Amino acid sequence: MINGLAPNFASGVEMVEYDEVCSAYTNLLDLYHKHPDWNVLRVFFNQCIAYWKDRPIISPHGSVPMATCMPINTKLFIDSDLQIGVCEKISDKYRIGDIKTGINWEKANSIVYEYYNKRVERCRHCPSVRMCDMCLTAIEYTDEQWDILCHNEQVYTRVFMYLFCEMAERGMII
């Protein structure tokens, strides 16, 4: 079984600092600017700025958005035991049915409610809530783990916005 927190905490995760991350990404961006034909960097930076480039326009008031894999989305998969899973990257405990009986809607909804309630509690006033990639397995995190990941999500949100602006100024956005 894959750990529900893998790979996030398998080796330990520390808080990152904005200046260090921004500097590292800027160095990579400078390299990509010199070598625009390097496909790996092109794909990497397109992923970094994808939200900013194609961001959905939603009301900032009201419910807390859930920008993550949810049961009954396009990431559903079937494992070797014919169980229906939410995402191939997370724990076996997130199986929501099987091929013979279909989706267990009570279990799927229970997972979503638990995740949503935790996000409402933790994320209601977060400036990065609409850009957050916090995984569904976040319902298993301790408060300390949430604090670390939330801090890091906010740092990367700022870095990716910086990259979007920097790439736009350099004429690198297609």
Question: Where is each model-derived feature located?
Answer:
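Flexible mid-to-C-terminal extensions adjoining Fe-S/redox cofactors in radical SAM and related proteins
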Residues: Q83, K89-I174
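Radical SAM enzyme [4Fe-4S]-AdoMet core and its adjacent flexible, acidic
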Residues: M1-G85, I90-R95
